[in-house]
Amino acid sequence: MDNYEKQVYTGRELFLKYDQDKLIKKYGLKHDEEYLYLKYIGTEYRINRRNGAIEYATGEEWTDCREYTVVMTIYDFLCCSGQEILPPLTGQWQPVGRFVTAGSSPSTDPFVEKYARAFFGKVEEVKQACICLGGKQMQRLAGADLTFEMPVLPEFSVLLQFWDGDEEFPPKILLLWDKVSLSYLHFETTYYLQGDLLKAILLSLIHI
């Protein structure tokens, strides 16, 4: 078993320690005797109530989820907050770096730039991909070609901005977080979620 698998099993064990009825109430989860259900970035997932394993819907079938970032984000979302009632999102958006002391968080620029280049010249396609994933187009902010509120988890959204490139400026992506986001997720998990969201947009874009 490699380190990733060990951490996934640690996440399962943590999830299984929680009162699932309280999680159902807290997050408004659909459920039955065997599974809890939630949507993550436009895809339906279910969590086995007995062993904590996570599966995702593929048509009429359910498939074991082996994406480490997806699995750990779902576990963290359900298990991060010790509050019985979560604070409502404020609509006050900020960069992820605002949550930590200056200089203490790793830069995501090279990672995000990879997706910005892939989206270059495809404003309409990126728009349709965001809509396919449940995104709501918002008023343009700071001159961005696209501004979307993306519902990524139950009652939890992030704000995506995209500026297309031209002869003078390269394309740019900026992801903004509600100021109470760390009541829902640990700081490190925001990086997993960011990657999962941009990957999902790119995959949707390819199929448009």
Question: Model-found features: residue ranges?
Answer:
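Short amphipathic C-terminal alpha-helix that caps PH/PH-like domains
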Residues: 74, 78, 194-197
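Conserved small/polar residues in nucleotide/adenosyl-binding loops
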Residues: 206-208
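Intrinsically disordered, low-complexity regulatory segments enriched in Ser/Thr/Pro
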Residues: 44-69, 163-188
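Helix-rich interaction surfaces within compact, conserved domain-sized segments
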Residues: 183-200
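Amphipathic, interaction-prone secondary-structure segments
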Residues: 23-50, 139-164
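Short Lys/Arg-enriched alpha/beta "domain-start" segment
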Residues: 1-34, 40, 70, 77-134
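Conserved binding-pocket/active-site segment within a compact domain
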Residues: 121-183
